[in-house]
């Protein structure tokens, strides 16, 4: 199995292809990407037969920016007979996967695939039963075993394969299913909520998103991102010349600071979180984020970088490299992750967690 399917946002196939080609090449896993515009997926075909599995096991999925999900697959199954689609799929998976822990029958995230999605939902139940009968799936779902993927690209046409549960997206189609809260001031609130689900392990939420923490929201108006912090019982400094939603001010947890997010400097030294969703050039936002992290003004940050029309992967890579260089230069040890989220549009979301100062004798306790 030498092909890897990567699901992505429709319209960002070229960026997804450029990224996987670059990062696979750095691990000496060579191949080429098959790209179809607005298809919502990319196929990276490795030159060596076993390199597909090697790629999805060795390259951390969390290091990918434009992929929502990935899995290794074999050849395309075509012209599945409508009276029995199950037998050929079972045949393709037998001997390839043993005791998979979960089945996901998926499609790309496009308008054309919506009808196909209805079929996938109905088809999952009988296919799961058949795969359990032959030992491709365990009798009960388990997160400790590989995930079996059946990916339909058209009626009667699908790829079959698997991903590793410790190195994939835990979400169906790589998309967390979030509901817009009716009392939130703007739909942008879903961007931050999704970022928290993607970047922070669930078992660390109580510690890293704790009641009573102090947070700063730069460019906060009208308060979509502030809403998420307030919901987690944090005290929030919302920085923006524009007004905040009255519903947030009424909580008593929000201090509205009417000033420019680029000029604001915090006057406390116990800020756990800084979040930022400002419409500005990526380089300017990245420089501001580097300043906050280098000075220890916050422990963790989530921010958005708005993308240009062309060379979007190169632009993101350049800004992340600049941020890493600034942290290295000032002896700050940090984890950096970036992802184009489902609720992002022409942008990517970046999460940085400051761990400790790497300089001997210094420890970051702020």
Swiss-Prot record:
- In terms of domain of life, where is this protein from? Bacteria
Where in or outside the cell is it found?
A: Cytoplasm
Q: What is its EC number?
A: 2.1.1.186
> Enzyme class, one word?
transferase
Q: Give me the residues that bind S-adenosyl-L-methionine, please.
A: 188, 221-224, 240, 260, 277
Q: Does the keyword Zinc-finger apply?
A: no
Record-annotated membrane-spanning stretches: none
Alphabetical GO CC annotations of the entry are:
cytoplasm
One Pfam family linked to the record = RLMM_N
One Gene Ontology MF term: S-adenosylmethionine-dependent methyltransferase activity
Gene Ontology biological process terms from the UniProt entry: methylation; rRNA processing
**Which pairs are disulfide-linked?**
none
Q: Which reaction does it catalyse?
A: cytidine(2498) in 23S rRNA + S-adenosyl-L-methionine = 2'-O-methylcytidine(2498) in 23S rRNA + S-adenosyl-L-homocysteine + H(+)
Keywords (alphabetical) are:
Cytoplasm, Methyltransferase, rRNA processing, S-adenosyl-L-methionine, Transferase
The answer to whether the entry has keyword Disulfide bond is no
UniProt xrefs under PANTHER family: RIBOSOMAL RNA LARGE SUBUNIT METHYLTRANSFERASE M (PTHR37524), RIBOSOMAL RNA METHYLTRANSFERASE FTSJ DOMAIN-CONTAINING PROTEIN (PTHR37524:SF2)
**What's the subunit arrangement here?**
Monomer.
* Recorded family membership: Belongs to the class I-like SAM-binding methyltransferase superfamily. RNA methyltransferase RlmE family. RlmM subfamily.
The protein's role, per its UniProt record: Catalyzes the 2'-O-methylation at nucleotide C2498 in 23S rRNA.
What's the name of the protein?
Ribosomal RNA large subunit methyltransferase M
């Amino acid at each position: 199995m030498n092909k890897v399917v990567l699901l992505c946002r429709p319209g960002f196939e070229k960026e997804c292809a450029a990224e996987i080609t670059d990062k696979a090449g750095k691990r000496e896993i060579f191949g080429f990407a098959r790209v179809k515009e607005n298809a919502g997926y990319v196929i990276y075909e490795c030159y060596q037969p076993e390199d597909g599995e090697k790629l999805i096991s060795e390259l951390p999925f969390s290091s990918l920016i434009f992929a929502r999900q990935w899995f290794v697959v074999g050849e395309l199954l075509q012209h599945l007979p409508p009276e029995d689609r199950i037998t050929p799929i079972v045949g393709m998976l037998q001997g390839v996967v043993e005791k998979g822990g979960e089945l996901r029958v998926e499609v790309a995230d496009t308008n054309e695939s919506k009808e196909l999605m209805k079929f996938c939902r109905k088809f999952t139940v009988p296919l799961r039963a058949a795969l359990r009968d032959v030992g491709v799936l365990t009798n009960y779902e388990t997160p400790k075993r590989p995930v079996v993927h059946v990916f339909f690209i058209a009626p009667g046409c699908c790829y079959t394969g698997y991903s590793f549960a410790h190195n994939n997206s835990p979400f169906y189609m790589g998309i967390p299913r979030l509901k817009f809260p009716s009392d939130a001031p703007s739909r942008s609130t879903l961007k931050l909520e999704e970022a928290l689900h993607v970047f922070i392990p669930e078992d660390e939420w109580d510690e890293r998103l704790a009641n009573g923490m102090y947070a700063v929201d730069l460019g906060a108006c009208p308060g979509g991102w502030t809403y998420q912090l307030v919901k987690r019982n944090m005290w929030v400094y919302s920085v923006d010349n524009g007004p905040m939603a009255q519903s947030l001010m009424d909580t008593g947890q929000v201090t509205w600071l009417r000033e420019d997010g680029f000029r604001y400097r915090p006057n406390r030294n116990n800020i756990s979180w800084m979040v930022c969703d400002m419409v500005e050039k990526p380089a300017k936002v990245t420089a501001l984020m580097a300043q906050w992290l280098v000075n220890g003004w916050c422990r963790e940050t989530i921010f958005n970088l708005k993308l240009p029309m062309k060379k979007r992967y190169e632009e993101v890579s350049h800004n992340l490299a600049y941020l890493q260089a600034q942290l290295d230069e000032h002896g700050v040890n940090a984890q950096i992750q970036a992802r184009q989220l489902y609720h992002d549009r022409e942008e990517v979301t970046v999460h940085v967690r400051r761990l400790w100062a790497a300089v001997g004798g210094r420890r970051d306790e702020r």
